[in-house]
Amino acid sequence: KAQPIHYLPTYRAEHQIKLFQWLGVVPGAEKPSVPFIMGVVNQRNYKSEEEIAEIEKACIVTADMHLAAMRTVRPGIRESEVAAAVAEVALANNYELSFPIIATINGQTLHNHDHSNMIKSGDMLLLDAGAETEMGYAGDMSSTIPADAKFTSRQREIYDIQVAAHEAAVAALRPGIPFVDVYELSCKVIMEGLKDLGFVKGDPMETVKAGAHAMFMPCGLGHMMGLDVHDMENLGEVYVGYDGQPKSTEFGRKSLRLGRKLEPGFVLTIEPGVYFIPELMDLWRSQNKFTEFINYDKLFTYKDFSGIRNEEDYLITENGARLLGKKIPVRAEEVEAIRK
């Protein structure tokens, strides 16, 4: 009698070929086993002490990669030179990169892997990079570094808003809290700061509930991390990050990879951002979108601003959360101190 065969979603082409050879499943017609997926997710979401120790090693080297960038960035060099200095730290520790380095003066373009630009005075470089240990465990951090010794006053105003959102999210981490609530909190803090500067108007939380915050934060707040930097991404966010519950389809909110209640043993990133995306500004203004919340006249004066993100890695504990690895400079004065 034929028995059902359980298999996971295929992620690589060679696995699709094997599935076809073994079971006759044509690529694109796969029907992965949800019970199998949930079994793997429920095993890998909870990190053992041995796994935490390995991730900690990755995060320590990842921190050193970011410290190297903070000492390297300056006007007159290319983004590629910063990326090379960052990669050197990982390779010197006999580690791999956990994902291709993002080192860009165009921080408003998410997941931008081009490194061809020359860094100029007045720029900021957004670095998103991590190390992967010999056992395959990942680190993942982001930094935003001024090209000059200090942030300009214009940069500092926005940077401090991002840091406030980051610190508010970290302070909220604890078992039992839905991560979507942490996301909304960080977005609310960003809207409060931007309202003080005249970019948005109205109640900050209403701005978030309406979805207008996605002009400035069209992405999520963080993701699970482990053997994959976006852990088990190929198994499906609805299972990994939402425990089988439906995700939002709203622009911005739909990019939140993690929304479920946090539990001890989870390892995740915290990475709110504040982005000024010219193409999105043009689109929404042409659609008269969220005019009750967004001050487009003010916003358009920041079309050339770029974007800001800082990111750290945390373990959810029995009573709260613990930073993994060593602390890197995040507050503006900390970054500027290492830039001197």
List the predicted regions and their residue ranges.
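Active-site neighborhoods and metal-handling regions in enzymes and metal-associated proteins
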Residues: 1-340
